[in-house]
Amino acid sequence: MAVTSPDKLNERYNALFGVADLENLMALYEPDAVLAPAPGKELRGHAEIRAQLKQLLKLRGQLISTQLSCVRQGDIALLQARWSFSGKSATGSKVVMGGTSAKVARRGADGAWRFAIDLPATPHG
């Protein structure tokens, strides 16, 4: 199901993450999107982003994300959300993360909005 409004991307991402739907999570990213999971680390394109999300989904955790803002200019939108994640590693250790994300989304020719840039945790978030 295509996301036809940028302010619905966060909600759709949360729903898909909750059921570990990797294929439809990937559909929320442009083919040449950039995901920057840590300072100085950039993952480019579906193959690299898929590998990262696959590892995160293995933690079998719960993601809670609240959208803070969605600023739109034409076919581009800047999204900001506050999120927390709690899961377990393969060894059973508790994994807890959280922060404030910033994402740039773009509307495609098909009318669907997708992430072009995903910064899960801003430096001061």
Task: Give the location of each predicted region.
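Generic hydrophobic alpha-helical segments
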Residues: 12-13
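Short beta-strand segments enriched in hydrophobic/aromatic residues
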Residues: 29, 83-85, 119-121
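A short hydrophobic beta-strand element
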Residues: 74-85
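Short, cysteine-centered beta-strand-loop-beta hairpins and adjacent loop/turn segments enriched
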Residues: 86-95
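Short beta-strand edge/turn micro-motifs at domain boundaries
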Residues: 98-125
